[in-house]
Amino acid sequence: MKRVQMFLAGAFIAVGSLYAQSSDAEWQAGVAKLKETIQTNPAQAAEEAEHLIKGKNKKNVELLVAIGDAYLNADKIPEAQEYAALARKANGKSALASVLEGNIAVKQKNAGLASQKYEEAIYFDPKCTEAYLKYADIYKSANASLAIEKLNQLKDLEPSNTAVDKKLAEIYYLKNDFNKAVEAYANFAMGPTATEEDLVKYAFALFLNHDFDKSLEVANMGLQKNARHAAFNRLAMYNYTCLLYTSDAADD
């Protein structure tokens, strides 16, 4: 009898999980469609958004925030604020709602409020990755040390998250701290998430650190992807020249 009960309980949990996944997929498809309708037919988009949050989804914070994000990305700030307020009403301690509020503040060029909201999101959920990254974005130029401190907190929580390394590399590069920039780039630049710009900056930082062999390797990697890229070609030439010079100097 116990085995039967355990089997039934397991089956019930599995069915519940499948239903939740199906329900999520349904509203996610609705939000994807909404993103297009917002631009082409705002009135219809408003109706679709209201339909999405009917019934059981009325307090679905993830959905409410997704709709708010869709409006915000379309520069519809009042509508984004409306859905941020609904998300906050559904869950007063939602990190997702705080991030949306922070994103709205960024759009309004209110850096102080945005940073406050991202801090709030981290308070509600210390593992809210987006809040750390967005906070660092606000302070990367105005207060790089504060941005780096926040990113290192996230790095402690998520050591293998290359998005953190990418942001750290960007900030160290802006600060002209090329030693630290090289360390950060090394954690992701040779992988699939690196852009051409990342590779150019990595190669240039290595060049400025006089690591000509590695800089040439990175530049050549960039040239394999884009043989006509001016910066990669220049860096390759600079590195060949420096390597030749140091080789000749050693021979003398």
Where are the language model's segments positioned?
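N-terminal leader/linker segments that initiate helical-solenoid repeat arrays
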Residues: L8, L18-A85, K89
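Conserved structural position within tetratricopeptide repeats
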Residues: I53-G55, A85-K89, E120-Y123, Q153-D156, ...
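Structural signature of tandem alpha-helical TPR/SEL1-like repeats
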Residues: N41-Q44, D75-Y83, Q108-K117, A142-K150, ...
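Conserved small/polar residues in nucleotide/adenosyl-binding loops
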Residues: Y245-D252
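Position-specific recognition of the canonical hydrophobic site in helix A of tetratricopeptide repeat
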Residues: I38, L72, V99, V106, ...
